[in-house]
Amino acid sequence: MDSIVQWYQQGPARYISKQVFVMLVSMLPLIELRGGIVVARLLKLSLGQALIFSLIGNIIPIPFILLFINRIFDWLRPTKHLGGLVRKMEARAMSKSESVSRAEFWGLVGFVGIPLPGTGGWTGALIASLLKIDVKKASAAILLGIAIAATIMSLISYGVFHM
């Protein structure tokens, strides 16, 4: 995360506020809120600002993934150049879906809420879409999971559990 912060300070800091940068980092797949909170801490933002902007950034992509990813994948799957990537993404997401498929709501909460590599809102929304979990149920589970991940990452980055 240090390299992301250094890159930001050497260029985009002139045009993008720290808060917006944290929000943008939190929107990225794989990095998400987990990275956004760490970046906020490195940029010396308050815990309140870190939470607000990383939560907003992590939540923004979720409805789009839940509502449109299956259609986008259906459209891209037959293409020569992107079909393989789509199949690879689907296979990777489904390989992590066992706990979610067994206990839909709580499985999704746990999957999104435990900040481990390859988990989070993006992958959780992708799995929920591929398993055809009801959008309202998936949204609630993912939001709860994101809140849990935010709590854990805040404790690690700002407080009790320093790593």
Language model: regions and residue ranges:
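Hydrophobic alpha-helical transmembrane segments and immediately flanking/interface helices
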Residues: T119-L143
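Broad hydrophobic/π-residue packing in well-ordered secondary structure
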Residues: L42, L82-G83, S129, A149
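Helix-capping/transition residues at the boundaries of transmembrane alpha-helices
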Residues: A40, A128-L130, F161
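Hydrophobic transmembrane alpha-helices of multi-pass small-molecule transporters
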Residues: L33, I62, A150-S154
